């Protein structure tokens, strides 16, 4: 970390670690979040989106969007809801796998009832069972995670490739911000996040 995190409103800025040509699926997702001009993502860290978390830190330097650490997924979504109400601009919330999404459901329902745009990103363990670690990935993987919140989101998706993820994020943003507004949910496969792609390929995805 760079030593510039003192004083009110200061933000820790990590020393960027990516080598030229060393890019991942989660990097394309992080860059797309920047292109969508989401200023913040509120999150409670979880291993299902470790790839995206890494990209937000090591590729983007924890800015545009900046991470806001929360202690509970319901808090993360509620913060995004409140930010949109005050500023008129959406922000993101990231929730961990099936358990984090279940924690977030009440706040997502509130945003739905309030017709407020909230961009909720989630993740699941590797959909390909051959890539799952024993036990832990199995209990954090679902075939249709979006079913938990489908009745009170405008749109949900679980893209199966990096190009599809970029398309999904753009579509989710448009759906979320088209009146009547409301929350959307995009679930990212852990293996998709950790798939290696080239630098040019990463830029082409966004």
Residue ranges of model-derived segments:
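N-terminal alpha/beta PP-like core and its mobile active-site loop of ThDP/TPP-dependent enzymes
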Residues: 2-205
